[in-house]
């Protein structure tokens, strides 16, 4: 058997390959750090109070807007204060997005991909009211209506996008105590999430119906101010991200085809590690596929869910591969038989599968429902928020435990190698140099694997926390920089690209020789090669199991010869 390219590649060629890949890794970090803006931006929109039109409250195709021809007349705070009922059932809170800047009308770009809206409310109670302290987890009923229009539409040509009667729970605390009223500020609450930002302008109308028989909105005094924070992906970051995908996608596809052709040339069935490498490359290619270009022409509200599914498949495959990769290099194995997923790794991989399925179910409950109702959120109820928070914490803890377990497996591999290195002095010089070179290369690759795993787990945990930052009420400042995101994404591609090259079968063939002659010839080859620092590790004849792809995995089955 000729072994893998990792074993047969000369030291000089290997150094050139590793240096080139490291330069590509640095380039990925620099692209994100120097050319890409921050991944997400936001606008803070103050709700404009408009007087509702009598008889149109139940007309879901009717919208009030605050800018342009035919804009509504805003209601002043003093008018609300002087009204005995605080203009209950007469007010509409209007949010028109995006806001103008420097007297220029801005519009959303399809490069911005998605839009998330969260609310922060200030409510007030009269000082003379018997109910001065709002109850814990105050329930609020909101009539939410979302509309859109495009650049060439008239100012009044708003088209309905979504409508829903939503319930939200407020957690408020006193902010100001005055003679007339007590002002309470409430924690942010999620309102809507759009998986596609296909239109130029969006309009949000909020009504807070008060109904005594149905006991709607009777426990809070009156709305004082409402602030909407509209969060969107930055278009410049999307362009850099898609550029990376467009460049990396054909490279990974090409190296996969090259790898599988070399495997099929061999007179044996592919080994487990070769299958896993192919599946890993396929999952990465699915992630690299720049489907986001379609959103520039078509409205695809399911793109967020599809992106989560693609990333989930890649995570599941990557985590599974690392367990198999470390396990296949365990030099002391329980069984000499050929490894299979079912025989050796079902316990390890079942935990990964269960974790990924749990996150998938959670994602379906959130973003799957948002395909029908963008105002739906699992975070809206106290129980749902606790369940969602538990999922995020559990996912983060599981990722940390996985990384520790992977470190343990790598340590065990290194320990096995250390135990077997004691037999190297009894080997011939050729065999000893052969295995010392393999061990050095393998250790370097395993350390690179640990580094990749550590950054992946860190990125996963930070991503989960950053996504939930606007949905739970903790003062956590997390900003995933563009350099970190592009760097980790490039690292995945470079790491898998390197594995497909280094673990591809080597087709160098060496003449068969008698056992007595082969030792002498091997020693001469090693000494001559060492002098020029161009050691070729395939010069050693091998009688290993043809189902093994690496000489290192059959180290314990070798018999030293002189």
Swiss-Prot record:
Cytoplasmic side: 1-13, 261-270, 333-344, 412-441, 504-562
One Gene Ontology MF term: Wnt-protein binding
InterPro entries, per the entry: WLS-like_TM, WLS_GOLD, Wntless
Biased composition (Polar residues): 539-556
UniProt keyword Protease present: no
Keyword Glycoprotein recorded: yes
Transmembrane segments: 14-34, 240-260, 271-291, 312-332, 345-365, 391-411, 442-462, 483-503
Membrane side Lumenal: residue ranges: 35-239, 292-311, 366-390, 463-482
Superkingdom of origin: Eukaryota
Cellular-component GO terms for this entry: cell projection; early endosome; endoplasmic reticulum membrane; endosome membrane; extracellular exosome; Golgi membrane; multivesicular body; neuromuscular junction
Any one GO biological process: positive regulation of Wnt protein secretion
Entry-listed glycosylation sites: 58, 103
Compartments, as annotated in UniProt: Presynaptic cell membrane; Postsynaptic cell membrane; Cell membrane; Endoplasmic reticulum membrane
Annotated segments matching region Disordered: 538-562
Protein family: Belongs to the wntless family.
Subunit structure: Interacts with wg; in the Golgi. Interacts with Vps35, a component of the retromer complex; wls stability is regulated by Vps35.
Record's function text: A segment polarity gene required for wingless (wg)-dependent patterning processes, acting in both wg-sending cells and wg-target cells. In non-neuronal cells wls directs wg secretion. The wls traffic loop encompasses the Golgi, the cell surface, an endocytic compartment and a retrograde route leading back to the Golgi, and involves clathrin-mediated endocytosis and the retromer complex (a conserved protein complex consisting of Vps35 and Vps26). In neuronal cells (the larval motorneuron NMJ), the wg signal moves across the synapse via the release of wls-containing exosome-like vesicles.
Protein name, UniProt field: Protein wntless
Organism: Drosophila mojavensis (Fruit fly)
């Amino acid at each position: 058997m000729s072994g893998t390219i990792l074993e047969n590649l000369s030291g000089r060629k290997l150094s050139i390959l590793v240096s080139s890949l490291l330069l590509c890794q640095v380039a990925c970090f620099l692209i994100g750090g120097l050319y890409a803006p921050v991944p997400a931006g936001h606008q803070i929109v103050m709700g404009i109070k408009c007087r509702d039109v009598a008889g149109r409250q139940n007309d879901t195709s009717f919208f009030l807007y605050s800018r342009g021809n035919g804009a509504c007349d805003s209601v002043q705070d003093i008018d609300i204060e002087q009204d005995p009922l605080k203009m209950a059932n007469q007010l509409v809170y209007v949010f028109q997005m995006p806001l103008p800047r420097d007297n220029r009308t801005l519009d959303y770009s399809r490069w911005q991909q998605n839009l998330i809206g969260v609310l922060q409310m200030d409510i007030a109670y009269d000082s003379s009211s018997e109910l001065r302290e709002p109850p814990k987890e105050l329930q609020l009923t909101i009539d939410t209506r979302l509309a859109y229009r495009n650049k060439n539409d008239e100012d009044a040509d708003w088209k309905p996008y979504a409508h829903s009667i939503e319930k939200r729970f407020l957690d408020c605390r006193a902010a100001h105590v005055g003679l007339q009223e007590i002002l309470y500020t409430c924690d942010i609450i999620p309102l809507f999430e759009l998986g596609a930002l296909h239109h130029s302008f969006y309009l949000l109308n909020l009504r807070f119906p008060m109904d005594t028989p149905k006991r709607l909105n009777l426990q809070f005094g009156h709305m004082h101010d409402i602030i909407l924070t509209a969060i969107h992906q930055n278009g410049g970051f999307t362009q850099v991200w898609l550029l990376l995908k467009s460049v990396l996608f054909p490279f990974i596809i090409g190296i996969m085809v090259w790898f599988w052709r070399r495997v099929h040339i061999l007179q044996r069935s592919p080994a487990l590690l070769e299958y896993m490498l192919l599946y890993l490359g396929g999952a990465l290619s699915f992630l690299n596929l720049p489907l986001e270009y379609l959103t520039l022409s078509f409205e695809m509200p399911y793109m967020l869910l599809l992106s989560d599914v693609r990333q989930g498949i890649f995570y599941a495959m990557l985590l599974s591969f690392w367990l198999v990769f470390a396990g296949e290099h365990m030099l002391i194995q329980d069984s000499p038989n050929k490894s299979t997923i079912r025989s050796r790794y079902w316990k390890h991989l079942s935990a990964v599968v269960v974790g990924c399925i749990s996150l998938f179910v959670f994602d379906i409950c959130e973003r799957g429902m948002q395909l029908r109702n963008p105002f739906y959120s699992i975070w809206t109820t106290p129980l749902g928020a606790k369940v969602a928070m538990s999922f995020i914490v559990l996912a983060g803890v599981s990722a940390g435990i996985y990384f520790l377990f992977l470190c343990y497996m790598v340590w065990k591999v290194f320990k096995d190698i250390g135990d077997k290195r004691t037999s190297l002095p009894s080997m011939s010089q050729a065999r000893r140099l052969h295995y010392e070179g393999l061990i050095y290369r393998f250790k370097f690759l395993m350390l690179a694997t640990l580094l990749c795993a550590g950054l992946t787990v860190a990125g996963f945990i930070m991503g989960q926390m950053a996504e939930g930052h606007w949905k739970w009420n903790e003062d956590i400042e997390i900003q995933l920089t563009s350099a970190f995101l592009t760097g980790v994404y490039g690292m995945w591609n470079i790491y898998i690209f390197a594995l497909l090259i280094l673990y591809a079968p080597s087709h160098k063939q060496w003449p068969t020789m008698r056992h007595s002659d082969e030792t002498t010839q091997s020693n001469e080859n090693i000494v001559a090669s060492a002098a020029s620092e161009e050691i070729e590790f395939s010069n050693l004849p091998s009688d290993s199991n043809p189902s093994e792809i690496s000489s290192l995995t059959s180290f314990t089955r070798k018999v030293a010869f002189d």
